[in-house]
A protein has these predicted regions:
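Phosphate-handling active-site elements
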Residues: 46-52, 232-236
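Alpha-helical transmembrane segments within multi-pass membrane transporters and channels
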Residues: 54-56
């Protein structure tokens, strides 16, 4: 309860079948995901985001892309992979407000450079990368090319660590994503401490400035700490 569990396609179908037997029908279907939610919020604030992803040529994939387009998030035809199954997440919410999730990644776990429209970056001011991609080996060549293209077109890079598990199990992938340095890092206090090996949030935020110009570290009910480096000094 309260956690997210990864599942295979058959396990996802078994769970849905169980809910059906228990006469529990899905109350809502909606697009989601770490980076997709960020793009949705950005579009809601008046931005014009482009989102690179990978879905199947099935009903769920069609719904997902339509949901993004309706909210003002642009995508590419390269996002659709023929003959594959779109990932999904079953979210059960109990009366106490706890969310328990089972996620089937589907074809999204096989995203490669073929699913990325690099031309979209030529008109972008920012390139936003989510930390979960650090755990996907097939996307690493595209990550390198995206960083190179961002440099060519003077686009700033922002990276979200996404989850403590990413820092624990894919730190090398995160370091590859960060390269020499990025403009902004977004993470929570646990992720910041894990990444920097610091015990205090302020020390962790300052240590992150070795990899970025600005670090935004959220801390639950305590709000957030923003560390910024300019010239030869840093400030919180």
């Amino acid at each position: 309860k309260g956690n997210m569990t990864l599942a295979e396609f058959e396990e996802q179908q078994q769970l849905l079948a169980y809910f059906k037997l228990a006469e529990i029908e899905p109350s809502k279907q909606a697009g989601g995901g770490s980076a997709a939610n960020t793009m949705f919020t950005f579009a809601s604030l008046g931005g014009k985001p482009f989102y690179a992803c990978r879905v199947g040529d099935d009903a769920q994939g069609e719904f997902y892309l339509k949901d993004l387009h309706t909210t003002g998030v642009a995508t590419s035809k390269k996002s659709v992979h023929t003959g594959s199954v779109t990932g999904s997440c079953v979210v059960a919410v109990t009366e106490d407000g706890e969310r328990t999730m089972q996620t089937y990644l589907g074809t999204s776990s096989d995203i490669t450079a073929e699913n990325v429209d690099f031309d979209a970056l030529t008109q972008a001011d920012w390139l936003y990368l989510e930390g979960y991609l650090a755990m996907t080996e097939s996307i690493q060549p595209a990550m390198i090319k995206l960083r190179q293209q961002a440099g060519i077109h003077n686009a700033k890079i922002a990276v979200s660590f996404a989850d403590p598990a990413v820092v624990k199990f894919a730190k090398d992938g995160l370091l590859n994503m960060l390269g020499n340095k990025v403009a902004v890092i977004f993470c929570n206090s646990e992720e910041a401490k894990l990444f920097t090996d610091k015990k205090q949030i302020k020390a962790a935020a300052r240590a992150l400035l070795e990899h970025c110009q600005t670090a935004v570290v959220t801390d639950g009910a305590n709000g957030a700490i923003i560390a910024h480096k300019s010239d030869d000094h840093s400030e919180l």
